[in-house]
Amino acid sequence: MKYHISLRTSLFRKLCLICLMGFISLTNINSQPSIGSFGVWDRGETMDINEYPFIKGSSCDASWNQVEKMSGVYDWSQLDQAVERASMNKTSIYISFAAGPESPDWIYTNGVPKVVTDNIRHAEKFPHYPFYISPEYQTYYHRFLTEAAKHIKSYPEEKRKTIAFIQVKTGCTGDECAYKGEPLDQKFSLEKSDPKWKKFRLETFEFYARLFYLDTDLKISLLLNSVTLESEGVKNEYVEEWNWATTTLKDGFGIKNGALSRGHHLSGERLAVNDFLPYLVDPKGLTLFRRSEMDQTWTRPWYQLNVPLNFYWGAINALNSGQSVWDITNVAIKASKEYGFDYTFYFFNKYAGQIFPETATDAFCALHKGLDAADTIAYPENFFGQAKKDNVVRMEKICASYSKYGAANDDKKALTFGQVQQRGDQTGFNDVGWEIWPDNYSRFLYQIAPDETSIPLWRIGGRITDTSSIYSRFARGFEHSTGKDALYFKLHEGFSQDAKPKVMSITVVWYDSIAGSTWKLDYDAGNANMKTAITVTGKGDKKWHHEAVTLNDAVFRCGGTKGSDLALVNTDDKDDIFSLMEVHRGEQVLPLLRPTAEVRVIKGYEKGIKYGEEGDESVRIKKKMEGEKNKEGDKQK
């Protein structure tokens, strides 16, 4: 069926564009969210910041079907309350205007075709969808967005300032696909790569930009999903969208990447870090911010092996990728306090806003090695086998070469999973993956020549259980027998800007495994030789410890051994183990930020629920639909 633009539709569009051009200024404006708003956010609007003070902001989805239940009648009460609450709490908020399957039903009796798909998992939540490219849909959709912009402009300035950004949602939720599943009637098909769908998305981007970003009365930054720059040797489907964003939103914009904060060693994370990090941390020119959310991944089998540990390394992974905003579900926020893993949220807040080295107050390096089977230089094909995502033999061979240091693959089936299936169905810790992050995780603090001077370690203290320390997942250490007796570190250029003595505080997290073992922390004090800050002797208690020291004469201009600012040095023939180093500009901040000594096991989830298992939402919906179908059949009989 063909859809023709009616005279009424055409006139409305023209009037919209004329009105828009009347109040839009096309000058460049600085509309980036405040760095102070970066950190952990409440994914809804329900959590009390007095009880959970780590919350930096919240989200409000003013969905079309809730705002405009009757054509032309708008109820903005939900949005008003959310903005008022953010203003009262002096926190931030981001807004989205979900449409697509969350469009009001009246549009389907006013010319918009209704689309039904074969997807069972989302059938209850999204029973139908609009045909996005129909002129009638776009007319009503644009009218709704225009009214949204008008309403936001009606807020006083102090309330508008609470709005950090607006997430652009063109399709289903924020996933940027037209439908969940395939349309039963294929004439409504709109694949992600379909030129018609790309055209619709770009036109929607343009409309949002005119309303919210280029309007000098609003100047609200936009967050986009499915925009990717060109990567060498990689086929990216969203380069056109990236090019539009970088030429239109010249002061910067936000990107969505959900996976990086939901775990570690996830397939494809290396590219997600490398592609965007130059625009997120110490950017030179175009500046982006990055948001992702914690969904129900933390209730799945892999996370439930040790919830505090997995949250911690998920946060570390996200910070390493330059993540700015981390949306957390209210259930996870409540559990974090009850079970003592809210330390991770405070840690994330500490570093999320450290964007520019000249003004950063903190830097960290979390010691880690990921065995990336896609790396043919580190793991040559002539020895380890062909580099293919499904080559489990290659992955196992790579892992075996590090097994003496604790590397293992607990769930071999999951080695070939994509990151979505990993999060849902993986049941163990794997130290090999495909395009996983291979190096240390860091922000402004880097280890010099890690593999030449130290050894990587996994599962420190033995098999990881639900009560293992968060630090036991990864570490690095000395290996005296091979001459690896020091770990050298340097700060990002600009963190320490001159050769004058400065006050800097250092924290080192280490594992005390050998009684009588000794090591020291040296630093660059501007002299020919490095100066010793502390010397530590182990007790052999098999526990993780924090050593903290404040330096009053730190120069940190890479004047130490191997061009280092700091060094962990072995002072005997025993091998010590380290997990984390932090640098703080100034005196130590009190009270000191530390994880709970005792890891508390979360009750009620135990083994976690895989996708499609009893208890999973998709199974419940499927059974409900089958039951309704059987009832209908009985009636007909």
Where in this protein do the model-derived segments appear?
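Substrate-binding cleft of secreted/luminal carbohydrate-active enzymes
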Residues: 94, 98, 250-431
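Short, surface-exposed beta-strand/strand-loop-strand elements in extracellular ectodomains
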Residues: 516-529
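Extracellular beta-strand ligand-recognition surfaces/modules
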Residues: 547-581
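Extracellular carbohydrate recognition and processing domains
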Residues: 528-560
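Glycan-recognition and processing domains
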Residues: 383-494, 582-584, 590-597
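Substrate-binding cleft/loops of secretory-pathway carbohydrate-active enzymes
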Residues: 167, 172-178, 189, 193, ...
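An active-site-proximal structural segment forming one wall of the substrate-binding cleft
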Residues: 87, 125-167, 200, 204-207
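N-terminal substrate-binding region of glycoside hydrolase catalytic domains
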Residues: 32-132, 295-299, 323-333, 345-346, ...
